[in-house]
Amino acid sequence: MNHFPKLLSSQIGFDVAETLLAGFDRHYCIFREAAIRAKNLFEAADWHGLQKLARERITSYDERVRECIAKLEDEYDAENIDDDVWQQIKLHYIGLLTTHRQPECAETFFNSVCCHILHRSYFNNDFIFVRPAISTEYIENDEPAAKPTYRAYYPGKDGLAVTLERIVTNFQLNPPFENLTRDVQCVIQALRDNFGTFNEAPNFQIHVLSSLFFRNKAAYIIGRIINGDMMLPFALPVHHVKPGLLALDALLCKRDQLLIIFSFAHSYFLVDMEVPSAYVEFLGSILHGKPKAEIYTSVGLQKQGKNLFYRDLLRHLKHSSDRFIIAPGIKGMVMLVFTLPSFPYVFKLIKDAFPPPKETTREQVVGKYQLVKRHDRLGRMADTLEYSSVALPLSRLDDALIRELEKEAPSMLEYEGDNLVIRHVYIERRMVPLNIFLQNGTDADIEHGIREYGNAVKELMQANIFPGDMLYKNFGVTRHGRVVFYDYDEIEYLTDCNVRAVPPPRNEEDEMSGEPWYSVGPHDIFPETYNTFLLGDPRVRESFLKHHADFFDPALWQKQKDYILRGELPDFYPYDRSLRFSIRYPERFAADHVTAATERAA
């Protein structure tokens, strides 16, 4: 079949293509404006404003898609456009993208709009971008009018200290640094502590991405050091340390440390990128093994990440032969979970009905997942990719899985030829369920898992999240050993919960009763009761009481709730606190403290 017509003769085709691209350009302009505004909010230490901006940006893409669909339907009666015109629309669109700075994202926007207009039977044909049509290699912006993707610095000329200061000051952050010279010396000392001294090769240079990465209460400088054949990735988090004063907080220069800050369990960065593919290529060079789909998602282009993930899934299915199976572990009452062993993700469907004592609805569960998508996940809640109409080959589905799907979620299934189409599914990174990790672990594993579990719940509390069902099976252990929450159907805002202490029993009958002798409201939580299902294993109990003895004290939970109600936001560090310069090199901060004390005395 000849996929390219001899003549592009449709004026409507060209006009629709222009309208589609204008819709994308509006979206990306708003996307970049959000990143620029993030810098202003960071400089002003407006943390609530940054949170609001991040939430609004997540919903912005779908709003722009709806706007574009409405315009196409109103002006061109898009649903009734002939097939040959649709083919020309795509080809005109490709022509318009030849000099575009974000062609891959524009292709995804095209798909998002067209898949709402066209029937699913068109999803894999020539009318949409099943594969990229425009290469993203070697795309550059218009310098010097625009910032380069990254800047190169040469420490061999002026010395490492001067170069590092120049790197930081080139970002032109408005609040001054408390003591940038001190911070730079901390960076140099951390480099020596990690790697010792090294001879400078002729190509010794530092590459730094031109835009800051904003998330939570931090801005990250991201770069790489090149010396001979060595390539060293690094991130420098910038924090407010006092009102109106900044400081470099740490040096992250190990691959695992960078992978954690770009993890699927963190919220998306706000970062200004004229050429996103160039940023993704740079990040890919320092995050070896991280899929492009996850990198696009981590920098806020989650729809592009979602598109690439689906292409990765289809390619994996072509080059594998194992079958989808029911996920190992304890089955949930709300979600049916299955996985493809050779593919590191799980697929989650909402069941059609939930057995007692679950009292929820499909709509409420969907709402909980949307809450998590919009909320700051702090590295403790897994991101989810939400898909509609996912077609999987029946030959790749285990018989037991098909029976389970037909039993638990028949309304979500549709058979089309050799495929089973799932109407709605969530996809998450596969982790080791914490209960299995604890069950099979050594004493050291158990201590690590319990310490991480307690830290995870406490950090979620600080972020105004009450997990609801806190059984170990609802948490997973990542490949970096982090404990992450992933079961959202009972999640609530902590500020909506009524923290209560268990009233003392009124008599011996109360004390011996297996049922509560006190009233329990729908939003009441009783931290003292959690020990009954968390401390059954003696080894778990020992580690839990060693690291988190306060976990079962209602005062801890109430304190966090009060803290949030006062509008305060805590500091979060997606790296070990021992890496913070103020903790790692206290002697370098002692002089500042003496000077400050002298000034106060004067």
Swiss-Prot record:
Chief location category: cytoplasm
Coiled-coil residue windows: none
GO MF annotation terms: [isocitrate dehydrogenase (NADP+)] kinase activity; AMP binding; ATP binding; phosphoprotein phosphatase activity; protein serine/threonine kinase activity
UniProt-listed InterPro entries: AceK_kinase, AceK_regulatory, Isocitrate_DH_AceK
One of the GO BP terms on file: glyoxylate cycle
Catalytic activity: L-seryl-[isocitrate dehydrogenase] + ATP = O-phospho-L-seryl-[isocitrate dehydrogenase] + ADP + H(+)
Active-site annotation: D383
EC numbers for this chain: 2.7.11.5, 3.1.3.-
Keywords assigned: ATP-binding, Cytoplasm, Glyoxylate bypass, Hydrolase, Kinase, Nucleotide-binding, Protein phosphatase, Serine/threonine-protein kinase, Transferase, Tricarboxylic acid cycle
Entry binding sites for ATP: A327, P328, G329, I330, K331, G332, M333, K348
Subcellular location: Cytoplasm
One GO cellular component term noted in the UniProt record for this chain: cytoplasm
HAMAP family reported for this sequence: AceK
Family (UniProt): Belongs to the AceK family.
Described function: Bifunctional enzyme which can phosphorylate or dephosphorylate isocitrate dehydrogenase (IDH) on a specific serine residue. This is a regulatory mechanism which enables bacteria to bypass the Krebs cycle via the glyoxylate shunt in response to the source of carbon. When bacteria are grown on glucose, IDH is fully active and unphosphorylated, but when grown on acetate or ethanol, the activity of IDH declines drastically concomitant with its phosphorylation.
Protein name: Isocitrate dehydrogenase kinase/phosphatase
Organism from which the protein derives: Paraburkholderia phymatum (strain DSM 17167 / CIP 108236 / LMG 21445 / STM815)
Upper classification of the organism: Bacteria, Pseudomonadati, Pseudomonadota, Betaproteobacteria, Burkholderiales
